[in-house]
């Protein structure tokens, strides 16, 4: 599988979307935030492949973990 995120000014004014679709990446996180499942997301956005979702979540996980040294936590 190639790239999973596409940013093109001609597609939704440059909003990051799943490659090969017009489905914004944000939609996946909105679904997950409201307690919906990956399967529900995929049912509603049939152009997105499960592999794309998994790779995006793995990428996000790696980015958060690798950013631990530069993020500032304020527990005040």
What role is predicted for each listed range?
Residues 1-76:
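Small, basic N-terminal interaction modules of short regulatory proteins
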């Amino acid at each position: 599988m190639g790239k999973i995120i596409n940013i093109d000014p001609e597609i939704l004014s440059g909003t990051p979307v799943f490659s090969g679709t017009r489905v914004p990446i944000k939609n996946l996180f909105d679904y997950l935030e409201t307690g919906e499942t990956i399967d529900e997301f995929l049912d509603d956005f049939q152009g997105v492949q499960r592999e794309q979702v998994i790779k995006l979540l793995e990428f996000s996980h790696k980015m958060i973990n690798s950013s631990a040294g530069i993020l500032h936590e304020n527990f005040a």
